[in-house]
Amino acid sequence: MISDTVIAILAVALVGSTVQAAPVDATATSTSGIIAVPISKSAAQLAREADPVVSLDWLKKTKAQAQYKHKQANARLHSKRATGASVLTDQGSESLWTGPITIGGQSFTVDWDTGSSDLWVPSSACSSAACNAHHKYTLTSTGKKQSGTFSISYGDGSSASGPVYKDNVVASGLQATSQVFGAVTSESSSFSSDPSDGISGLGWPALAQLSGTSYFWSLINQGTVTSPVFSFRLATTNSELYLGGINSAHYTGAITYTPVTQKAYWTIALGGVSVNGAAINPSVSSAIIDTGTTLVYGPTAGVAALYAKIPGSASMADTYGSDYQGYYTFPCSAVPTVALTFGGSSFSVPTSAFNLGTVSSGSKQCVGGIVGQGDGSWLVGDVFLQGVYSIYDVGNARVGFAKTV
């Protein structure tokens, strides 16, 4: 694939709103300042495109991260009971969609993640190799240290921790005043190669480990965004997070909305799953929509039923061992059309996203991007989201999908 410099549009409009405001289309804010910003793909993604063989180590790592991320957040959840578009960079095998923010006037790149609800970046007090590889936060005149500490762990054994601060956070001109965030002083060495400096969560407040609201919820509460809605276009080029509305330039046709069933993750009802037009039993009829997860994970039984409909498919565990339980291969010459149904509308997984690459050099078997894991909700990540324009409506507690362009 040819490497391009990507041009994305940032539209900024600082207009007061209430939580009940209706979603605002980007075309309604054409009087706002518009800035064209060039971004490029990461080295990791370019390397992956040049090599069609999927990394077996990456398969293990990405599954472990997805599994542990939601297990940890669920434990925390149970213990509790104007517009602006931010340009995103596809970080490919790093499993991240990153974009720029400033904290106290200092620039950072963060992973925008609908599957978590906290904001954290490295602190200048951190001297580890991982921290030194990234931008670090220094306390400013607008910042203030808070009581308590922040700590998070990941499925591959890595972790990050540090004190809590408040400072002004800005993305695409939209400022959240006195935003709470973690400033990491201890960070595992495995973070050294991460393309982002930290994470900005877009999940509901119930998921948060930090006390206080997340960045986008602060924008709503402070009357900064036009509408309590954000939306994503995720693609190999021109990816965008649109804060405070919907960008009609990135979708076509009608938007199908599905109500959120639990205000923690963006969890909605899954209406069905099909393979090459044939319906299968999904086993579980709920789905978590998560931009911070690369693949699509489903209940073991549901995913087994899916691949049973694909001639020539095989479980990777039979050949490569239990570390690859839940992964399947299929003939590269016949990439299936898999579709998920939400709100009565069917949306296909892009075949280019479903096909993760050949299982080994010269093999005619490719690895599928839908993986069996456990018996809980479907976890719908970027393999599906690259085929839709996704809308997250806080005010009406619903998720919308439309055909992306």
Swiss-Prot record:
EC number assigned by the record: 3.4.23.-
Identify which top EC class this enzyme belongs to: hydrolase
Query: What positions does UniProt annotate as the active site of this protein?
Result: 113, 290
| Matching InterPro entries | Aspartic_peptidase_A1, Aspartic_peptidase_AS, Pepsin-like_dom, PEPTIDASE_A1, Peptidase_aspartic_dom_sf
Q: What is this protein called?
A: Aspartic protease
Look up the record and report any one GO term of the cellular component aspect: extracellular region
Q: Which family does it belong to?
A: Belongs to the peptidase A1 family.
Q: Give the residue range of the signal peptide.
A: 1-21
Q: How does activity depend on pH?
A: Optimum pH is 4-6.
Indicate where this protein resides in the cell.
Answer: Secreted
The yes or no answer to whether the keyword Zinc is present is no
Q: Which GO terms describe its molecular function?
A: aspartic-type endopeptidase activity
Domain Peptidase A1 residues, every copy: 97-402
Temperature curve summary: Optimum temperature is approximately 40 degrees Celsius.
A biological process term (GO) from this entry: proteolysis
Major place of residence: secreted
Biological classification of the source: Eukaryota, Fungi, Dikarya, Basidiomycota, Agaricomycotina
Species source reads: Phaffia rhodozyma (Yeast)
What gene codes for this chain? pr1
The record's listing under Pfam families reads: Asp
The record ties this protein, via PANTHER family, to: BETA-SITE APP-CLEAVING ENZYME, ISOFORM A-RELATED, PEPTIDASE A1 DOMAIN-CONTAINING PROTEIN
Query: So what does this one do?
Result: Possesses acidic protease activity. Hydrolyzes casein and azoalbumin in vitro.
From the record, give the cysteines joined by S-S bonds: 126-131, 332-366
